[in-house]
UniProtKB/Swiss-Prot annotation:
One of its GO terms (biological process) is mitochondrial electron transport, ubiquinol to cytochrome c. This is Cytochrome b. The gene is MT-CYB. It comes from the Eukaryota. Its main location: mitochondrion. Its cofactor is heme b.
């Protein structure tokens, strides 16, 4: 969904809002793609945080190399 949104989005500060309005109004099912992207990314990050919480609960932080690689992957995901 991000690829379809990126084809119509303009990151310029003057035209960003109008490009989002263009996606919602003029692109076929653009509103659906936008909402599916927002909900899908929210679900992805909820699952990511649950996975981290599971690792904390089961004491996986004692494996420092594995834990540090996971933290690096978390930061790369958010970047």
């Amino acid at each position: 969904s991000a690829l379809f949104l990126a084809m119509h989005y303009t990151p310029d500060t003057l035209t960003a809002f109008s490009s989002v309005a263009h996606i919602c109004r003029d692109v076929n099912y653009g509103w659906l793609i936008r909402y599916m992207h927002a909900n899908g990314s929210s679900l992805f990050f909820i699952c990511l945080y649950l996975h981290i919480g599971r690792g904390i609960y089961y004491g996986s932080y004692s494996y420092t190399e594995t834990w540090n690689i996971g933290i690096i992957l978390l930061f790369l995901t958010m970047a």
